[in-house]
Amino acid sequence: MILDTRHHIAQIQKNGYTVIEDFLSAQQLAETRRVLALYLETHAGRNSFEGLLTERVYTLVARARVFWDIVLDARIMALCEHFLLPNFLLTASQAIRINPGEAPQPFHSDDSFYRLPHPRPMVSLSTIVAVDAFTAQNGATNLIPASHLWDDAKRAEMYSFATGSGGKKADAALQHEAIGAAMPAGACMVFSGTLIHRGGQNQSRAPRTAFSNQYCQPWARQQENFILGVPQDVASQMPARLQELLGYSIHPPFIGQLTASHPVKALAPDYVNRVTAQAAAVGAKLPE
């Protein structure tokens, strides 16, 4: 599918989000459902923000090859290349299933933990892909168009920048400005990390499943520590570009270096930790 990149860039700049229809192929959608069926129903949410009736599977990129291709999708890469610096990173990769009876999530923005003034140049760009169709009844994402343009003063009126989410009073006020992002299964919403949104209330009798890949500037700390989270034997099989997105890369001049060498060397089967090797060479003993 050929993407009208300029159209989607303009939509993100104006409204804070855009939707790519038919993002997943039929084969990708079927494989995604197959893989997620193995993991879901075993990862209950831990708090009201995650959702006590919401299931989340983190580090999705490590769990099946289908997610490698989706993370690297050329249409998403084109948008990231426009809004983010070269060497941008994958910051989060997770599945989200909102089960029947789940309450609406608190309003929030995905990168509120970067304590930088608003409005601001893009620090992160998020995607959410519908595995099940998003409807008003089953928990479609609620979003506030153009809220990525709000300054800190406007955010402070209804939204807690300090905590990254609104309280019940703030959520009630924001709800009047929000719209539901209904979209068919296989569609992808791409949005600014500062867009205020939330997972919707599931009033249906069926779960609503989605997954979210998020990308960030190369100088920003990633939400997920993929270097530790993705087994090295899995990471070593990934395409070089995906390895770079996980953090096996260097942002000039030397952000991300591994003991003064390139971190991708750690994926080689014969890799020896340089600190260990240097200590052995000089007869030094490392801390125990």
Residue ranges and their predicted role:
Residues L53, F107-S112, M158-Q175, P207, ...:
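Short, surface-exposed loop/helix-turn segments at secondary-structure junctions
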